């Protein structure tokens, strides 16, 4: 929403698609492409559903590339916020993932609450009913008490808090193992904390893995964690990992950010 080039290119493609496929309505997934869709739709006046997967303008404030020197020059979360409000007012209906997100949106934008539908995150049935157990993962942790974290490991995800609790945890759980499946640019700092606390034997950094392996990690775990820090984004959205854990019957420890607190 800083430069119009993407909108111009994509709107032309979308307009061609609408015209040649007899489209009757449009469903826009998240804010990134919304401007292109609305721009293309001027010629057709179709009903548009704007599906907001998250509070993107808010979470962008925490992105490393947005906070870099070039990012601060080229990317404006404020302009994204203005765009979000503009297209929410233009949309025929809006989808958000929590009641808290609906409440926040209606409180910020003068729109009828009947236009805002809550449709929560979920996992596909095949994730928990049609997976193949990877015995290598299961055997690797068969003798450990596994605390599992799935997903992005950036600072706002709260793993630093978990790492700093390990010296106390291992006093009572001798076979404890924190297994982190995911990564981010913050990993070097997490690795430094592990080294400083001398807890390397209790932490496995697995990096990103194919989602097909997630059920095996979950089945190997005693507890799944979601230690998110509180902010306007985390307080109004759900982490997918919560539903992945629960779908396979894995107990969950979560932080008290509002959305997680209400869910669990």
Segments the model singles out, each with a brief description of its role:
Residues 150, 177-191, 207-208:
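Glycosyltransferase donor-sugar binding loop
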Residues 95, 123, 139-166, 179:
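Conserved donor-binding/catalytic core segment of Leloir-type glycosyltransferases
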Residues 1, 49-82, 112, 126, ...:
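Acceptor-binding helix/loop patch of EC 2.4 sugar-transfer enzymes
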Residues 130-146, 171:
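Nucleotide-sugar donor-binding and catalytic loop/hinge architecture
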Residues 100, 122:
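Carbohydrate-associated surface elements
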Residues 157, 206, 212-217, 224-246, ...:
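Nucleotide-sugar-dependent
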Residues 8-19, 35, 39-43, 56-58, ...:
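Membrane-proximal helix-turn-helix segments that form the acceptor-binding/catalytic region
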Residues 188-215, 223:
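Nucleotide-activated donor-binding/catalytic signature segment of Leloir-type glycosyltransferases, i.e.
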């Amino acid at each position: 929403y800083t430069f119009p080039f993407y909108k111009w290119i994509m709107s032309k493609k979308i307009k061609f698609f609408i015209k040649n496929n007899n489209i009757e309505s449009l469903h826009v997934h998240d804010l990134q492409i919304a401007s292109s869709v609305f721009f293309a739709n001027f010629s057709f006046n179709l009903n548009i559903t704007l599906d907001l997967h998250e509070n993107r303008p808010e979470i962008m404030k925490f992105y490393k590339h947005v906070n870099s020197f070039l990012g601060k020059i080229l990317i404006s979360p404020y302009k994204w916020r203005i765009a979000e409000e503009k297209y929410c007012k233009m949309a025929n209906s809006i989808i958000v993932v929590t009641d808290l997100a609906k409440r926040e949106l209606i409180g910020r934008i003068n729109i009828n609450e009947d236009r805002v539908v809550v449709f929560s995150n979920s996992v596909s049935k095949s994730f928990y009913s049609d997976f193949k157990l990877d015995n290598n993962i299961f055997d690797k942790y068969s003798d450990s008490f596994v605390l599992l974290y799935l997903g992005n490991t950036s600072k706002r995800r709260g793993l630093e808090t978990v790492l700093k609790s390990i010296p106390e945890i291992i006093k009572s759980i001798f076979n404890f193992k924190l297994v982190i499946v995911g990564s981010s640019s913050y990993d070097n700092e997490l690795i430094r904390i592990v080294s400083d606390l001398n807890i390397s034997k209790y932490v496995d950094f697995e990096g990103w893995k194919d989602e097909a392996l997630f059920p095996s990690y979950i089945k190997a775990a005693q507890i799944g964690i979601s230690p998110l820090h509180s902010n306007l984004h985390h307080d109004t959205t759900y982490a997918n990992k919560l539903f992945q854990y629960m779908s396979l019957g894995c107990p969950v420890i979560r932080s008290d950010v509002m959305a997680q607190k209400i869910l669990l």
